Design a protein with these regions (language model features):
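Charged catalytic cores and adjacent phosphate/nucleic-acid-binding surfaces used
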Residues: 1-18, 22-27, 46-50, 54-63, ...
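Secondary-structure boundary/capping motif
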Residues: 34, 94-97
Length: 232
């Protein structure tokens, strides 16, 4: 048996809203004393691939992705595959599990952040685990609701920093009791519920600022789609 300290939900600059290059994420994780991190960028595995390519002996990389499904976001760990966006979340969960990946529903009840739990309770039961602490949700109501659901249905509970900047890497730490210091062993331990969490909230000022910039980015994207085209 070996205890692994791990942040299971981290974004890099490969995400549209990520600010931190891969090498800096790794440096911060090592500074925080983590044994492993899972890089889960939005709908891309480029960040995870870059991290694996660095082959840093000081930290284990669990490749992953945060998939935008029809009902909301889904973490898929143990893969460099890019899963199709917009599909039904249950279909994506089953596809990922069939390929040996680990599925986690992140921030399942956060109303403004693509919360699968608000649209598909079946997905929470189908997934391998539920993220019951997300450091970027300052008010604890949604996290508490996720934990209550997980306990009721005996689902493994995970934490994640959901860091989009380097300074918050490690704000959601998991202590995983794995058989070996390998990615498959870590994922298997999570499936079996051999995991405990230690958490720290993102400061309210930072959370508010990040949320504001995300709203601005979405409005700009929507506005650009509505621009009239020239008729020639």
């Amino acid at each position: 048996m070996v205890l692994i300290t791990c942040d299971l939900h981290i974004h890099t600059s490969a995400s549209a809203d990520g600010k931190c290059p891969v090498k800096d994420v790794i440096a911060k994780a090592k500074e925080r004393g983590l044994d492993a991190i899972s890089i889960t960028d939005h709908d891309t595995t480029e960040g995870a691939k870059q991290a694996l390519a660095l082959k840093d002996p000081g930290i284990m990389i669990i490749p992953g992705i945060e998939v935008s499904t029809k009902q909301g976001h889904l973490l898929v760990l143990g893969t460099t595959k890019v899963f199709e966006q917009g599909k039904d979340v249950l279909e994506t969960i089953r596809e990922a599990k069939a390929e040996g990946c680990l599925t986690i529903v992140p921030h399942p009840y956060h109303r403004w952040r693509h919360a699968v739990g608000l649209h598909s309770p079946d997905a929470l039961r189908e997934a391998d685990a539920i993220e019951v602490f997300n450091s970027r949700y300052y008010i604890g109501t949604a996290n508490n609701r996720a934990a209550k659901f997980a306990r009721k249905y005996h689902k493994p509970m995970t934490a994640g920093s959901d860091a989009h900047t380097c300074q918050f890497v490690g704000y959601g730490i998991n202590i995983i009791d794995a058989e070996e210091r390998t990615v498959p062993s870590i994922l298997d331990a999570i499936r079996k519920g051999k995991i405990e969490s230690r958490c720290k909230k993102t400061p309210i000022r930072t959370y508010t600022s990040q949320s504001f910039h995300n709203v601005v980015r979405k409005v700009r994207r929507q506005t650009s789609r509505l621009k009239p085209r020239r008729v020639r």
